[in-house]
Amino acid sequence: MNKIPMTAEGYTKLQDELKKLTSEDRPKIIEAIAEARSHGDLSENAEYQYAKEQQSLIEGRIIDLESAISKAEVIDVKSVEGNDIKFGATVEIEDDESREKQQYQIVGEYESDIENKKLSITSPLARGLIGKTEEENVEINSPKGLKSYTILSVKYI
C-alpha cells in the first residue's frame, strides 16, 4: 500500500470533513431521498434524481477520504531536517522575470489549497523545487512556458 504524505493539519482537516459527511451530510441526503420518494413516481421526480446524485457524490467523497486517511503518513514538519526542499517545506521564491515574491508550503495532494499558499507535492512547481536549496535557480515548465525562479528561503515551520 502506497503511503500518502500529509501534514498533521491536513490529516485533521480530512478527518473533520469525513466526520461532517458521515454525521451530517449523509443523514440529510437520506432524509431528502425519503421525502422525494414520498412524492410518487420516481421516474419523473427531479427532486429524487437530484438527491440520488448528491448521495452518489457524498458516498464517493467518503470512500475517497477513508482511503486517503487509511494510507496517510503524517509527517511532523517541524522535525524535518536539512537545508534542501522536501515535503512540508515553506519556500519563498522570486520570479526572475517579474521579481514577484511568493511563499508556499509543499503539502500532500489532498491538502493543497493555492489560495492559502499550500502547494501539492505533485504540482510541477513543487516537483521542480524538491531537492533544491536556498539561492538556487530553478526552471519550471508552466502552462505559460518556461519560468525561472530563485529560491530565497527554505523553512520547516
Regions found by a protein language model. Give the residues of each.
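Residue-level signal for pocket-adjacent positions within structured domains
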Residues: 1, 16, 37, 43, ...
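Short hydrophobic/aromatic patches at helix-to-coil boundaries
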Residues: 3, 154-157
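Conserved NTP-handling cores and scaffolds of large molecular machines
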Residues: 18, 22-25, 69-73, 133
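Amphipathic alpha-helical coiled-coil segments
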Residues: 59-73
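N-terminal cationic and glycine-rich segments that engage phosphates or anionic surfaces
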Residues: 1-63
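Non-DNA-binding regulatory cores of transcription-related proteins
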Residues: 75-149, 155
